[in-house]
A protein has these predicted regions:
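A well-ordered secondary-structure block
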Residues: 89-153
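Active-site beta-strand/loop signature of hydrolases that rely on acidic residues for catalysis
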Residues: 1-6, 36-66, 111, 143, ...
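N-terminal, active-site-proximal structural segment of metallo-dependent hydrolase catalytic domains
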Residues: 1-76, 84-105, 300
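Conserved beta strand-loop-helix elements of the APE1-like EEP
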Residues: 75-78, 102-119, 257-273, 297
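Solvent-exposed loop/turn segments at secondary-structure junctions
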Residues: 6-9, 58-61, 87-91, 116-117, ...
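Short hydrophobic/aromatic beta-strand or adjacent loop that forms the aromatic wall/cage
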Residues: 105-108, 136-142, 260-265, 288-293
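Surface-exposed cleft-lining segments at the edges of enzyme active sites
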Residues: 23-29, 57-59, 124-133, 159-168
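Metal-dependent phosphoesterases centered on the DNase I-like endonuclease/exonuclease/phosphatase
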Residues: 164-270
Length: 300
């Protein structure tokens, strides 16, 4: 299984984004965007995974030259069932003045090598007031894959909030997601969630990667008490011998000493056995995230 926030194909290693304190609001050019999307698609294909979760996939956005990136990924991952969940539909944003961000339609995707019987989109609680303007229409998708033993593998694709005033909304989002997964587990189903949690999944990324978070407070650890009474576990991808972060701060081009953190990962129910979870080191060449992988088996 692979999860990858592709950053709408714009975040090359020399890219910074205005909403993160950087300068850019569009991909550098149509040509560079297309090249990045091609490399992203090839990276995904190379993993030969059974399941993929992909975030920040634009379908009709000014910032990505109105490329339908969902169609590009579908063509790359032929033979897979796919699900699209829209989590960003923004009218024309006239900022920054030098190159307005424009309008955006974006979402997250799930790909499965086994047929998906049904899927739905569930809205998550989001900020109100001014913060709502910079946050997405947060959601997660729920896709059901029938198993031979009569149970279902429930695939949850998620991208939680980053731009919040005090972190309360992100906690409420996690609570809703975990309650949903727990309910499905109690029915006897297998539950696996993958995506960008915008939380420090390791809990100590600054120590693991040797770079202080400093004033960057957007990626807080996930409170352990959220899992109390739940049969759900957090899986933070990490190779102890060669630790690689899953995300870089996008307030400047990628450079040595830049703040990095692991925010991409997985949640699994107790009847799912995880054998490995790692981060693929792309050097942040075509996204501000690295893809993360997890190998697992379903218990009888």
């Amino acid at each position: 299984m692979v999860s990858y926030n592709i950053g709408f194909g714009a975040y090359e290693d020399d890219y910074s984004f205005f909403m993160d304190g950087g300068t850019e609001s569009w991909a550098w050019s149509k040509e560079r965007l297309d090249e990045n999307l091609s490399l992203i698609a090839q990276t995904l294909k190379d993993q030969m995974a059974d399941y993929y979760f992909i975030q920040e996939v634009d379908t009709d956005s000014t910032r990505s030259y109105h490329r339908n990136e969902a169609d590009i990924l579908r063509r790359a991952l032929t033979g897979y069932s796919s699900v699209w969940g829209q989590n960003y539909d923004s009218p024309f944003l006239f900022w920054p003045l030098t190159q307005p961000h424009g309008s955006s339609v974006s979402g997250l995707m799930t790909f499965s090598s086994a047929p998906i019987a049904s899927s739905l989109r569930r809205s998550l609680p989001i900020e109100t007031g001014v913060m709502k303007l910079v946050d997405l229409d947060r959601c997660y998708t729920v896709s059901r894959v029938p198993m031979e033993n009569g149970r279902e593998l429930i695939l949850y694709a998620v991208h939680l909030s980053a731009y919040t005033s005090d972190g309360t909304i992100a906690i409420k989002q996690m609570e809703m997601l975990l309650d949903d997964m727990q309910a499905e587990y109690e029915k006897g189903n297998y539950c696996v969630c993958g995506g960008d949690f915008n939380k420090d999944l390791l809990g100590n990324s600054d120590q693991v990667f040797g770079i202080s978070a400093g004033d960057y407070t957007w990626a807080q650890p996930v409170p352990a008490e959220l899992f109390s009474g739940k049969n759900i576990a957090k899986i933070a991808p990490l190779d102890q011998d060669n630790p690689v972060p899953s995300c870089r701060n996008a307030d400047a081009p990628y450079h040595s000493g830049q703040y990095v953190v692991t925010v991409d990962g997985f949640l699994v129910s107790d009847n799912v056995t995880v054998s490995s979870a790692t981060v693929i080191d792309t050097g942040f060449a075509y996204s501000d995230h690295n893809p993360v992988t997890m190998t697992f088996t379903l218990q009888p």
